[in-house]
Every structure is written in C-alpha cells, then in structure tokens.
C-alpha cells in the first residue's frame, strides 16, 4: 500500500465494487490487529490509483444446472463447518466437502489432511482440496513487509468464487459456509470506526456473496449459512450432543506456531482457550476432541478478555464476546469445574452472571432469525435447532 499506482494487465473486474467494500469494512479490524491507524489505512487505500488494461467489464456466461438436493460445504474442520456438514446431511442436501489450502498456513494442511482421511473412512466423503496460491499475496512475511492482517478478511468472498467449479462438478444448488450469529458482532475502535472482527462472515455480507455466486452461475448456485441462527456456544452444543460422530473431528486452531507442528491444537492461543472453555461449559470431555491440556489455568488469563487479557481475537473485544465468556465461565462453574480461572471468576463475576442468567441464557441459546437461508430449507433446519436446543437446556445446561 506504499505504491501510488497499480496497473493490472486485465479487464476491469465485475466484482471490483464488492471487493472494495469488503476491504474497506475490514480495515478497522486489520488496524487493531496490526496496531496501526484505521484512518491511515483508509487514506492510503482511497488515494491509491488503480488502472486496468481494459476498462470493459465482461459478464459471465453459464449454462449449467443444479440439483436442489446437492450442496458443497466449505469444510475447515472447525465447529461451524462441521455442524454445517452434519445439518446438511440430516436434511438431505447430500453435502460434498471442499477445503481451500492457504500455502502460508504452516501446519494447518497437514493436520486437516490427516483428519480428512479418517473422515472419508467413516463417512465415505472425499475432501476436495484447492490450493489458493494467490493467498501468498497477503502473506506479509512472504512479501517482506512483516506479518499483517491485511487481506485475510476477504477469505469468504474469495473462497465462494474459488469453490464455484466444485459446486458445478456436483450440480450443487447450495454453497454452504459456517457463518454463525456472532459473526455480525462489532465494536467501536479507538478512532470511532465501527469494527467488524469478521465482516466477510457477517450475514449482511453473506447476502452479497450470494449475489456474486448467483450472478456467476446464472442463478443456479446459492451461498448460504445453515448455522446463522446460532451463537457459538449453541453451535458447540448442537454439534457435540446431536452429532458426536462428526464433532470428534473438530480442529478450530490455526496451528500457526511451532506448538501446533505435531498436534491439531497448539494449546497456546486464544482459540484453543475459547474452545476449551465452551466445551467445559457444556459438560463435554475436552479429550474427546484432542484438547489435552487445561486451558483455564492462571497462566492462560491473557487469552480471556473477561480478565483483561490482551492476547485475544478482536471478537473478544466486543460486548458480545465479553458476555459469551461471562456466561461460559458461569456454566463451567455450575458444572463443577475448579480450575484457577473458574475460581477467579467466582470471586469477581459470579454475582453479575447470576443476576443476568436468564438474559444470557436467552441470548446464547435462542434461535435468531436468519436472513441468508432460503425458505425451502429454513423450516427443516430450524426444526432441528428447536428440538436440540430444548434438549440441551434441559439435559446439558445446569
């Protein structure tokens, strides 16, 4: 972003306005992670001159068809994509699974390839892998400018276009992304900008991605999220209580460091800490998904914004993220966990959690109204959640 002008040896892209909005809306989150000024990023980007060899915008031509009982799930083996797969399987969408490989993610592909082999043996579904070589263009270390968050917030938009040929090969009507309810959470940064930690996964933006895939496929391929009505903790509960055969494959960690070289959970990051907390809150054995170390010890306080931790994902800085931790620690306490951070929670926050218990229960276990789910599948999906959330609150939530 230091260059005054960029010349592309291509036509002007059809989706230039989409990527422009996606990028602009992601800047505040990038700035927070990179510890730079949002205003500086916006100014440099807006002042950058972009030219194309040919200004004509070419429209796509597509003559394929799609089947209403076929889908492709963008599967990362995180809880969201695993639940998406399980729900699509239950409602008869015959899900195929695909994974976009980021070359700069050090150990992620190795672990997911191993999981995919086991997954295929158990469920008979092959994981289609696509290497996203252009992803190196946002790898700051590879480019020699240092680690940066810039560009990573375009992933969902990019992946939808990358996976279109996969959808075509299976005549899939639906391209399914694991964008749950809290993806719309946001906060105001220090400069007064609205900051979305995951704008490309928000429901409003998923509608725009859907418009892109519909345009590219002649209205044949829809981009949807079947878990949009659920908060994180509800996603975890439904996955591990209704679909334990699928849930045991969970890998939510990015394994970005040497700690994740030989195991699918690095056990030294805020994501591992959060998943461990949610699992304990729901009364599930962490060993079931390979979380072999207690992440609720005092030395892991830095991973929880509730205790003032700074080594956290930007989502944890939202009021929703803070309340999620409050409620999850409360449930872990009620489930009899006596870890150091649970004890600290009882001293500092137990009274607040008790006073807000009904509010928090409703917030995190209600079914939120979806806007990305087509009517023809919405009823079947919501009936599953009504049944399972009622059972969860009766049997698993103390």
Label the predicted regions.
Residues 80:
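Hydrophobic/small residue at the entry helix of a nucleotide-binding pocket
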């Amino acid at each position: 972003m230091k260059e005054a002008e960029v010349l592309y040896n291509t036509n002007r892209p059809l989706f230039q306005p989409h990527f422009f909005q996606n990028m602009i809306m992601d800047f505040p989150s990038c700035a927070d992670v990179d510890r730079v000024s949002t205003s500086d990023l916006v100014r440099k980007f807006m002042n950058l001159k972009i030219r194309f060899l040919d200004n004509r915008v070419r429209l796509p031509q597509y003559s394929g068809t799609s089947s209403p009982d076929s889908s492709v799930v963008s599967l990362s083996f995180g809880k969201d994509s695993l639940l998406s797969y399980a729900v699509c399987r239950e409602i008869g969408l015959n899900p195929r699974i695909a994974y976009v490989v980021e070359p700069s993610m050090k150990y992620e592909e190795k672990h997911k390839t191993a999981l995919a082999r086991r997954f295929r043996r158990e469920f008979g579904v092959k994981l289609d892998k696509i290497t996203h070589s252009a992803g190196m263009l946002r790898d700051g270390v590879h480019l020699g400018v240092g680690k940066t968050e810039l560009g990573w917030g375009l992933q969902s938009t990019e992946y939808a276009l990358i996976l279109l040929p996969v959808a075509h090969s299976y005549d899939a009507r639906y391209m399914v992304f694991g964008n749950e309810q809290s993806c719309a959470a946001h906060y105001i940064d220090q400069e007064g900008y609205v900051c979305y930690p995951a704008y490309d996964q928000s429901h409003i933006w998923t509608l725009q991605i859907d418009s892109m895939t519909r345009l590219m496929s002649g209205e044949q391929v829809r981009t949807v999220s079947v878990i949009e009505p659920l908060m994180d903790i509800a996603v975890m509960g439904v996955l591990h209580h209704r679909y334990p055969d699928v849930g045991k494959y969970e890998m939510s960690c990015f394994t970005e460091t040497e700690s994740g070289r030989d195991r699918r959970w690095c056990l030294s990051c805020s994501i591992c800490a959060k998943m461990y907390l949610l699992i304990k809150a729901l009364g599930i054995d962490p060993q079931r998904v390979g979380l072999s170390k207690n992440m609720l010890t005092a030395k892991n306080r830095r991973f929880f914004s509730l205790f003032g931790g700074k080594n956290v994902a930007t989502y944890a800085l939202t009021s929703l993220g803070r309340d999620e931790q409050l409620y999850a620690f409360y449930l872990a306490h009620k489930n009899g966990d006596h870890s150091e951070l649970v004890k600290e929670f009882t001293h500092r926050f137990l009274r607040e959690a008790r006073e807000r218990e009904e509010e928090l229960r409703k917030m995190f276990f209600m079914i939120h109204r979806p806007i990305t789910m087509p009517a023809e599948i919405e009823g079947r999906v919501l009936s599953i959640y009504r049944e399972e959330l009622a059972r969860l609150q009766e049997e698993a939530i103390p």
